[in-house]
Swiss-Prot record:
InterPro entries: DUF986 (IPR009328). It is found in: Cell inner membrane. This is UPF0266 membrane protein YobD. It comes from Escherichia coli O127:H6 (strain E2348/69 / EPEC). Belongs to the UPF0266 family. NCBIfam families: PRK02913.1. It holds the Pfam family DUF986. Keywords: Cell inner membrane, Cell membrane, Membrane, Transmembrane, Transmembrane helix. HAMAP family: UPF0266 (MF_01071).
Amino acid sequence: MTITDLVLILFIAVLLAFAIYDQFIMPRRNGPTLLAIPLLRRGRIDSVIFVGLIVILIYNSVTNHGALITTWLLSALALMGFYIFWIRVPKIIFKQKGFFFANVWIEYSRIKAMNLSEDGVLVMQLEQRRLLIRVRNIDDLEKVYKLLVSTQ
């Protein structure tokens, strides 16, 4: 097993840990989930480049009769990338005392102001940064508003 194989195993393990945390652990942290809203995906060009480069590496490994374990590890990495970028749905998860946005816990007390832009983006102003929340379905913003009013 080469250093390349070890690095590939490390990347696969990190992506797998992230997928398990995002799918199973995060919704159970900090109390019961009150509301989970699917968000719009960001640009997919990065994911196309990532998976495309891995496919090129797989092709190169196969045509040059590279190590079989490396080819399988590259395939597993491509599948993990495909899952993370295309199958997994990003979401905002509201709890009793705060919410998870981009896998970061934010308490309601940190929200200084909220605005709704014309194109349906909810803007939350925190102490030092702004969160731009782009929901998949515009009607979900009403659910978020009702939840935030009831918890504040």
